Amino acid sequence: PDNTIFKGDVWSFTTEPVAYPIQNVVATSNGISEGLSGPERTVDGSGLNAADQHSDIANDMWLAMAPEGEALYIQYEFDGVYKLHELLVWNYNVQFEMILGFGLKDVTVEYSENGADWTALGDVEFVRATGKDTYVHNTVVDLQGVPARFVRLTVNSGWGMMAQYGLSEVRFTYIPVQAREPQPADGTTEVEPDTVLSWRAGREAVEHQVYLGTDPDALTLAGTSDAPSFDPGSVNLGTTYYWRIDEVNEMQAVTTWAGPVWSFATQDYIVVDDFESYNDDVDAGTTIFDTWID
């Protein structure tokens, strides 16, 4: 060797984010809105560009009056219980917002797992919007990792003296503490009966509880694992199975996070590889009648 140094390529990788945005959020309100200014405008991305700058167009935002004798609120529902991280807020942002003051100011934040029992997170002041079409979110609410499927914002005051209040957009983020990315993927068919189940572990999980069965409403504990994989043993052919992973960490405030129910269907029969190589050659030891018997 002549000790020549061959410089390698430079590679890179990106670590996963601290938190992920919650998708498919449903927004409702007890407020009275007109035209296209309903609460859904705060979660549908209307008015946001690729740089997360919000427009100053009124129809891209929510604006409402409180019902008589009631405090105005806007409520958000997710598709399950999440460990909430932050709430990003784009306040009401029409061109003359600095004069009108329709944006929310003092807000009470509450959360719930079932939509019936509510816990107050606290009172927060939302920063006023700029009234420009380059406006980016300027309020971040720490949601403290609470478990919730619902979040409600109750309006205590706005930035002006008007009887209407509004928001442009909100975004909730969550910590991925539940199991995800199952293998076999959810709904997979023709799965071999000796398949080992695997998944991407929840971020805080110490133990994984594996529930498995043929009835999605009556899954039983099949076993536990300290790794994100589980061998269920030989399952039956031609059967649809349902499974769920509960992520467990006794040191956390919420000790168990139940995952979604996934499914897979096993193949109807086993395919024998190289079956055509069997014949009636006794001397070669490849006789089919000595190897395969119905």
Where are these regions (language model features)?
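Recognizes extended acidic, P/S/T-rich segments that occur
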Residues: 207-238, 250-259
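Extracellular fibronectin type III
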Residues: 2-16, 177, 250-269
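Surface-exposed loop/turn motifs at beta-strand-loop junctions within extracellular Ig-like
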Residues: 1, 157-159, 247-251
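Aromatic, loop-rich ligand-recognition surfaces of beta-strand-rich domains
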Residues: 7, 16-20, 52-122, 135-178
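Conserved aromatic anchor
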Residues: 195-205
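Surface-exposed loops/turns
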Residues: 80, 147, 186, 193, ...
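Extracellular carbohydrate-recognition regions
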Residues: 16-35, 267-294
